[in-house]
Each structure stands twice: as structure tokens, then as C-alpha cells.
Amino acid sequence: MVALSAAGAWAQEAKSPGCANLDPRACLVLALDAMGGRARLESLKSIAYTSAGHTALVEQSYRQEPFITAYERLMVKVDFAGNRVYRESRLTWPEADPGTSEVVTTFVFGPQGGVRKNASADGPCSLSDLDWARDTLSLGPARLLLTALQAPDLHYESPEVLRATSHAVLAFTTGRKQVRVLLNQFNHLPDAFETVEQFHDHWWQWGDVHRRVYLDNFQDFHGLVYPTNEVEERNGILWQSRQVLSLDQNVAIDETRFRMDPKVAEKSAQGKGWDRPFQADKSQELAPGVTLFEGAWNATLIDQGDGVLVLEAPISGTYIQGVFDEAKRRYSSLPIKAALLTSDSWPHVGGVRQAVARGVPVYILDLNQPLLDRLVKSPHKLHPDLLEQSPKAPRWQIVSEKLSVGTGKNRVELYPLRGASTERQYMVYFPDAKLLYASDTLALNDDGSLYDPELMREVAEAVKREGLLVNTVFAMHQGPMPWTNVMALVQKAGS
């Protein structure tokens, strides 16, 4: 009998480490007590904190891990009573030109939505801004356990080992989001929480992303035991880390800081985010049969007589399907021969899953295949796209050296750049038109100077190396420019 009793106790402990013989709600109460108690957390009507952090720029086209990093200082006020958030951000952007790396923004969120504060007027915020604010109010360290307490479906899931320690796992639903909280079996503090969701930031293209946020460096702030460090992991990548530098509780609320234009806030909430439609109204012919469609991310149709090439598949499946539809409208008798994806930046390849689902061959750089293989295989069950509904294998055409595509006046030649900053991009050359597509290397600042001149310097080296004659150049974020003008800007930047 003693042996059976011990076995039963062991089974209970194995199911919910640190919470043996407790139901999920009682286990949660232990966690609340560890953070200072339910009453202490519920007494928080507002907090203000400053933090320093960094984010790995996993979505950029420079190099894969170890990734280049952006750094950010935040000053945040959270009004729990009014469901409002005020955030001042000072971001250091590593890809900026010298002297222009710091970006300062102010974001305000309330029940009606959110805005970015500008000097003259409020501007729309992004859907990812709204997600961040809602997470701050419901899943931030001061509210995570209280949100779990309100969930009618709170339950145990299988325990997990974190940092060599078994953790009880409590799971619940908030809104449409499934949340799992990992409670330390010894001190009952929440060491991490997890979600699976489709984000509205640069991770949107990956569909169902597994997020784990590690909570660490707990400190006692007048009875509130608060984790001052958060490390966010997405799909196994340590993506972001934030360290709280100061924390004040029940601070006074300055109503003037939370004022916002309600019409702009409503517009923000109605934004499409990355799932935006293609607009064909802004187009220009760069050469007979070569049509550029300019937008935040450009796309180009190339008529080769026996079919149409689509140059770039950016943003989303919705966007690139619009490009395919425009190709069909303009060239109804011609098939889409292939899509040319010249880089691996996530916004630049956001439509690749749609191209694969449509059975379109896709020309990709050799270095980019591992990332694109993962992107094509990534689950999209929460918001199924065409590839999730009808899986297909990609028809990759690998670019590892000069490669000619098509014949006739609009044949193109693909050349890997192989520069230090451009090694994950290839350029597209139109020999007859002496026209060059320079991937994501050419963009102008507001004063007409080159953004990150090193990129175009590496393009110039590749053009010289391959012996190309170029009259006109265009790129992902730049319309056509005379080659001589761009070379003059490169020379000026280096002088």
C-alpha cells in the first residue's frame, strides 16, 4: 500500500512538477504568491519602466546568423485601468548611413486603436504595434498570471524541462491565442511563456510561429517580484532581449500623452499589414515588354515572347497573385515562365509560397535555398494560404554563376553579386536594353544621396567583373536611373 501511495504521488509530481495533487488554478495561485500575491498584482493600476534591448535583424538580406543587431531604449507607461500604453523608442539601426542611425518614435495605444505621434499630426501605426500593446496589457510580466486566472479553460499540459529543471505547464486561451506558461517546480515563478501565432511584423511570412519568452532576473520592487529580463525566441532563434532598467508602480497618468486622433487610430486598426493587395496603377515601361510596377516593394513583368517572367515576388501571396493576374490581363495568351527572386530578405520573398503553389519555377541564389526551403515548409494552419491547402514541392532553379534565361530581345542574364554586403543577392541584366536590375542595393535618401553606398559600390564591382555595359539601373526600392548618375553618387560618397 505504501508503495502504491508513493507511486501515485510520483505520478502526480511528474504530471505537474511542484504542484502535485493541486488542480491548475491552485498551482497558478502558487505562482501568483511567488510574484507577490494576487492582491499585489491586482493593485497595479499603472506602471512605468525604462528598458534597453537588442533585436537580431533576421529578416535582412545581409548575412545569416550570427545576425546584425539593432539596439533600442524604451520609456513605457502602461495604464492597466484604462487599457492604454504610451511608448517612446530610441532605436539604433545598424544599416543606416553614418550619423543617421538613431530613429526616435512615439506610439500611443488605447481602446480605440493606436497612432504614431509626429510633430505635426498623428500617423497610423502598424498592426505589429497594436499586437505589442495588447501583449503588454495581457501577457506582460505584471498581467500574465492574472490573464491566466481569468481563463475558463485553464489546464495542465505535459511538463517541460527548462534549464535542467522540470516545470509545470499551465495552458489557457486569451482572445484567439493559445498560451502556455512554464512554472518552476521549486520557486513557482513563471520562467517562460509560449504562443503559436502569425505575427504582423517581419515574421508574418512564416505563418505559424512558435514563440517562447524567457522571464529572468527577478527582483523585488516593494513587494512585487518582477522579471527584469525578457528573452524572446521565435522558431528556435534567439531574436530579442530586453532588460528593465527602472520600474515604478502606480504612477500618475498624464492624459495629454494619451491623446490621439480617433480617425487615425481607427485607420490603423483597419490596416492590411503585409496582406496588402497589388496596385497596377503606377507602372512604366523600361524597355519594350519590360514593365515596372512601383510601390513600397517593386515588381516587374518581362515579356519574352514564349512566356512572362515575374521579377520579384515580394510581400505576400495576395500581392504576388495580383502580379500574376496583371500578367494574365496584359499577356492573356502567355504562361508565366518563372519568378526571379534576387534576395532572401523576408519581405522580398513573401510571395514565394504562392508562386510554389501555382507551380511556377523560381530562380533563387544558391546561398538562399536553405532559408527558402524552410519558408516553403513552414506551417500556415492558423491562416491557411494556397500552399497550405494544396502542398507542392518547389521548382527551384539555382543561380550559382552566370545564368541566361530566355531568348530574344528580352533575354536576361543572372549574376550573383558575392559582395560582403550583397552576397545573398543576384542582379538581372538585360543585354539588348543595357538595363540592370540591382536587387536591393539602390535607394536614395531624402537629400538625393545614396542610402548605404557600399551596396552600389559592390554592384559596380560586379558589373566591372562581368564586363557589362549598363545605361540604366533600377532596383527593389528605386525606379530607373542613369547608370552614370548612380556611379557619380558612389564616387561622391567615397570621397
Predicted feature descriptions by range:
Residues 284-327, 425-444:
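Conserved beta-strand hairpin/beta-sheet module of binuclear metal-dependent hydrolase folds
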Residues 231, 460-495:
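Divalent-metal (often Zn2+) His-rich catalytic cores of metallo-beta-lactamase-fold enzymes
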Residues 163-262, 429-431, 438-439, 444-466:
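Gly/Pro-enriched, hydrophobic low-complexity segments
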Residues 318-363, 465-470:
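Active-site metal-binding motif and surrounding structural segment of the metallo-beta-lactamase
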Residues 19-26, 33, 108-179, 185-187, ...:
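Flexible, processing/modification-adjacent segments and terminal tails
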Residues 241-305:
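Zn-dependent metallo-beta-lactamase
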Residues 20, 26-33, 37-121, 153-161, ...:
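N-terminal mature ectodomain segment of secretory-pathway/periplasmic proteins
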Residues 44-50, 81-88, 163-171, 190-192, ...:
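Short, hydrophobic/aromatic-rich segments at coil-to-beta transitions
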